Amino acid sequence: ILVFSIADYFLEAFMANTLKLPVGIENFEEIRKLGFYYIDKTRLIEQLLQGWGKVTLFTRPRRFGKTLNMSMLKSFFEIGTDKTLFDGLYISDNKELCDDHMGKYPVIFLSLKGVEGLEFASAKRMLCTIIDREIDRHYYLKTSDVLTDEDRTLFTKMLHGQDDNIEDSIRMLSKLLYKHYGQKVVILIDEYDVPLDKAFQNGYYKEMVSLIRGLFGQALKTNEFLQFAVLTGCLRVSKESIFTGLNNFEINSIVDIDHDEQFGFTDDEVMKLLLDYDRSERYPDAKEWYDGYHFGNADIYCPWDVINFAKKLVSDPSARPSAFWINSSGNDMVKRFVDKADQ
């Protein structure tokens, strides 16, 4: 038995260090299908379903795996998913949960990362474009035999951008998906706060808050076709400003114990990654440079830094660590709001 255990260990290590390191790749399906190294965060699925909040907002710093986790949730819940993507991952051991929920829901997925503009009108157009792309992803509704003629006409208008009621667009798409599938909808909204940050920078914050409040109010509050929703962002914007009246609304931040290990890398995960690539002797450097965060009860490393450092070590075992995160996206948003509050 010991011989087989050792053999299995070396086989796993060999397979791991032949995997590519996913620098900048935030698509779960791409990582799993194209042979990239993946640190398993699928326990988040189990935690969400066992906690079952109607609307959950996760706030974490930039470059901590929020978008990848949202992509993972989409791949798990969406009808028609490739279930083999989850083979060998934590969640696959919970067979009952997988049987009940994997590939069982229509999903609306929006990333608001690209919503920006020097004035409100251009930012609103960008938001409309992002919503239009998601509507187009569900093009099959145009010829659905389940929908009525009136429903299909409405969808065609939405598809061609002829329905200018942007605030009701997500709820309306939810309704059509529900009627088509006979199943309530999962809504995933990534980087929800980016439009507000860009608006704050460019002087149209009040207008954008009003628009987002209306959009979220229809999609998350008065939406009878909603199964549950998950949002991510860097900041917790005041509930009174855009989440007014939402029932069963949960905010999970860096001080909360729940989900504290699901965004960012734990100490054990970093050690295993370096061991898998035969660079375990550089663990002290990784810990000194990148173990600077404490979420809930967990010490957490910035994934962006760790992955970039590991990639450098693969080609150059003596590579020096550096602050990769500073050269990527930063958290300027936080500083701007703090500076404004101090004035």
Describe each model-derived feature in a short phrase.
Residues 2-343:
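Phosphate-binding site recognition
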